[in-house]
Each structure stands twice: as C-alpha cells, then as structure tokens.
C-alpha cells in the first residue's frame, strides 16, 4: 500500500479518488478553515472517514508544535490555495510559522507549509506529490506572469524532485463537468519513477508518450495540425529554458517574468532547473458524460429548487447580454457591457464549472439552471452538484444546502484523481520491479 497524507483536505476529494483507484492508505489528513469558527468541511470529512488520524488544526501550528504527529508517508496530496507565494512568506514561515507581517495575501503561507513538511521529513520525505490548483497558477501574478509557479518548481527541485504538470479539463476526458485545473506530480530522487525518468535519453518522452500523466490524460502538441502528433525540439511549440537564481531572485525578477510573457505552457516537466513545456490539446475518443446524465428523478426534487414565475424576469436579465449605462453609488455614470451566458444550461453537454456561489434561491448569472419540461426551470440540487464532481450521493449531507453547494464549488473532480492514482500506482510498482 502507498501511504498518503492529505493536506487542505476539504471534504476529501483526493481521498475519495485514491480510494477508488485502490492501493492507497490515507494515514493522516488535515483540514482547517481559518476564517470561521464552524468547520463544515472537516465535519463532513470525519463523518465520511472517521476522526482517527485527522487534524482539524491550523497546519502551521501542527508543523511548529506537533510535527511528529505527521506520520511518514509515500505520497503527499493536496489542493493548496492559490494566493501569495512571496519568498518573504518563506522567511516568515521559517522563523515563526505564522503570518504576522501583513505581507499581501492571506493563504500563500500554505504552499510553504507543504515545503516545510518536505524539508522537515528530510530523508523520510515522500517519494511522490500529487497537487491541484487553479490553472491560472501558471500565470500568476499578472505583473510577473509565471513567477509564482517558478518559485514552486524551483523550491521542489531544490529538494530533489523531478516535477511535471498538466492542465486538465475534466470534461475533455469524458467527465460531466468542465473544470480546468493544473495537476502537479513530483517524483523524489531515489524513488522508482525518478530513477526511470532520470535514465531516459529524452526526458520529453515522459510527458509526450509514457508518463504518469500522459497515459490517463493523453495530449498532443497544439500546432494547428490535427494529424501531427510528433513532438520534438524541432517543433517551435516545445520550449526549453532554465530557471536561474535563488528563490529571492526569482521573486524580484521582472525580466523573465513580465505582464506579457507566458513561460509555462499547459504541459511541462522540470529536472535540475531545466524546463520543457508546450501547449497541448486533449486526445480522448471515449464516452462523454453530460449534465443530463447526473440529474435526479424529478419526483425527488424539493419544491424550493424550482424557479417561480415571479423570479424568471430577474434570471433572464442576469443571464442575458447587457449593453447599458449605469451609475455608481457616488453618482458617476459609466457604460457596462457583457455577453450572454447559456440559459438554460444544455443537458447534452458537460456542465459549466461549479462555483462556490451555486447555492441559494436568489437569481444569479452564474448558477446552473435547467429546463425540466417546457417552461419549467430549476436549479441543481446538492446531489447533482456532487455527481458533477463525481462524489457519491449525499457525500456532504451533514451541511445545509447552500453550504453543500459552496463545498462542491471548492472541490475537485474525483475522477481525475482516480485516474492519476491508478497511473501512479501502476508506474511505481512497475519500475520498482
């Protein structure tokens, strides 16, 4: 069994996916919401999986005062918040493990908590990492695009990892929701997979042909030619460069990282500070799930999910295109325009991305609305939102409906983790032999 710790666990998406993949044992988990007294995500996590080896404490406090409570493990997983990756945070973290300086951002310290665990474990640090984040991580911050991701990659290579990443839209691979996220896999020096990659004559073969991510999520280079699946440095679309300098220098670098440059494409790998990266398109020819596939029977839908005729005008306005004059609260006139969004949502395609504001009766531009019969409309239920993320029904049943929607807006698509988990497990044991 591959032993796992799950950080920033939420309601347990990584755990559900790895349980479905089989061959993994979650030996410790942490979920802490610093901004509220109530801890609904952690409560749901323990309701599903039990409270043994689960921590509902500030991870910084755990690392500072209870580091030995974090067991040794083979795989660290987590969907860390995408906020501020300032190296000053790292210095602050190393000195106090707390944010007391007021440096911009409130959750950037959470990346450095992963780093602190890897450093603290030393020779016993995990062989593998599986991380998830919003895809715009590759382009943060807007004034120095790619800087934050470079800091993450550089800090991991300093700890002896080969790192690959891939932007995966779940719907591109048959799943029922269009949810685009960057997934990061890292392999430590000495691990079976690291040894294999390190011995490859051409490291790009790992991300183009037979790697942990390419096998379950095959992609081809995006060069406008549907017939061209060959990848090499002869193709101008594949880029190679070095990440140079200390973490502090990377943070201040405004030459490499500019408002217009985009150094990191949606597929890539880094070894010893050398990056190979390219933009790619999905290559999937299997079955596709749609929004219509996850709907409950109408007789099971509570009445409050149906849209009343009196609210329909507001829904239509918010969903529609706008090209109008508006006035601010201070009396300043301005022009406002935006395009229409699909209304109602198509049932024969994967859904739009679930957002945290999905719950509640109030009309909204972004909530999903379906037409269940001519002229009869409703919102999606918590169970349907769970199904769009490929959780089991009622995974979040301990929370109120609006909070359940919020939690699903923060969750990942379990099917992605399941496929990555199966691939990692297979490759680990194959190369171990």
Where are these regions (language model features)?
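Flexible, glycine-/basic-rich loop-and-beta segments that form/coincide
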Residues: 175-262
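Conserved S-adenosyl-L-methionine
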Residues: 56-57, 135, 161-172
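Conserved Class I S-adenosyl-L-methionine
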Residues: 144-164
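C-terminal target-recognition/interaction regions appended to catalytic cores
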Residues: 254-433
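Core alpha/beta nucleotide-donor-binding catalytic domains of modification enzymes
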Residues: 2-125, 134-147
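Residues that flank catalytic or metal-binding motifs in active/ligand-binding sites
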Residues: 152, 164, 178-182, 350
